[in-house]
């Protein structure tokens, strides 16, 4: 049974061309790029080429690219750098729907005397820019907001946000881990000061990422040690990972226009067909301002985990919109922030496509999903009894 992988917002397949580019740096070219000898110099050249490739994808200058180990490091580095550069300012603005790499840092900073404003979202997952405007003060050091939400695909009006942030003199950081390769970017004309990307979301290996730091932005490094990355990120460079990220960035730039069209068409077909065939389901998130590859659908009166287990039997990989873990039945913080009813929250499934997704794969999901939902609803003691479902959820949460 072949795998149908529709969980690309979690991670992506490494492109074969990326694997080919990496291999020599795992076998033949193993020197240290900081070394003075020719062998090390070859590695230094490879790192410079990759930096240029990443810069081209972002519409940035290569001197503005700092290689990191992942998106989480990039987010941490950007947030800490912004605060260290402005020690007199103690206020941060973010949103309720950020990735934990941002939210948990902000929560920790609250214990260190910082004040954090968590902007709300509406039922479509969009921000109220008037709330942002009212939250900005002269004490605001940093505004950190994701470009696109990883669960719903909702895209925020980043340039409008950035314009308001810059008018108030704060640093603007954007977690673009989900946006890069799915939305064309041009940092040369952007209001963004710092921007995070992660390799494994764009068909590069895990363990490599990059942080864009606009020229002129004061930057204090998170990792202290050697002189690597022009003193902005200490530690011997992960050359194979960097080469892989560079190649992946080059490929994303080549394929982005055709990928957007293909993914949008396949996503819309999947979404519209499931909505037509399955009663009591709805799309979670903004259906106009969103990533081309992402749909999050709530199937009422059943658990998302049960849907995922059923899909898994057919070799179909997706993700639950519910962040349920052992011992907890609380759904994802993103969907809760949107104010969705429990009947939808718990049965939400995210399908996230990529340029490798095929028509036949979408056909297969369309074929099996109606039967899965019908069977699970038949097993549910509540079926379409919304009051009974809500009562059961309240009782469960009351005994946690």
UniProtKB/Swiss-Prot annotation:
The active site is at 324 (cysteine persulfide intermediate). GO terms for molecular function: cysteine desulfurase activity; iron-sulfur cluster binding; metal ion binding; pyridoxal phosphate binding. Pyridoxal 5'-phosphate binds at residues 71-72, 150, 178, 198-200, 236. [2Fe-2S] cluster binds at residue 324. Its EC number is 2.8.1.7. It is an enzyme of class 2 (transferase). SUPFAM superfamilies: PLP-dependent transferases. Gene3D superfamilies: 1.10.260.50, Aspartate Aminotransferase, domain 1, Type I PLP-dependent aspartate aminotransferase-like (Major domain). Its cofactor is pyridoxal 5'-phosphate. The keyword Glycosyltransferase does not apply. It catalyses: (sulfur carrier)-H + L-cysteine = (sulfur carrier)-SH + L-alanine. The modification N6-(pyridoxal phosphate)lysine is found at residue 201. PROSITE patterns: AA_TRANSFER_CLASS_5. InterPro entries: Aminotrans_V_dom (IPR000192), Aminotrans_V_PyrdxlP_BS (IPR020578), Cys_deSase_NifS_bac/arc (IPR017772), Cysteine_dSase (IPR016454), PyrdxlP-dep_Trfase (IPR015424), PyrdxlP-dep_Trfase_major (IPR015421), PyrdxlP-dep_Trfase_small (IPR015422). Belongs to the class-V pyridoxal-phosphate-dependent aminotransferase family. NifS/IscS subfamily. PANTHER family: CYSTEINE DESULFURASE, CYSTEINE DESULFURYLASE FAMILY MEMBER. Catalyzes the removal of elemental sulfur atoms from cysteine to produce alanine. Seems to participate in the biosynthesis of the nitrogenase metalloclusters by providing the inorganic sulfur required for the Fe-S core formation. This is Cysteine desulfurase. It comes from Nostoc sp. (strain PCC 7120 / SAG 25.82 / UTEX 2576).
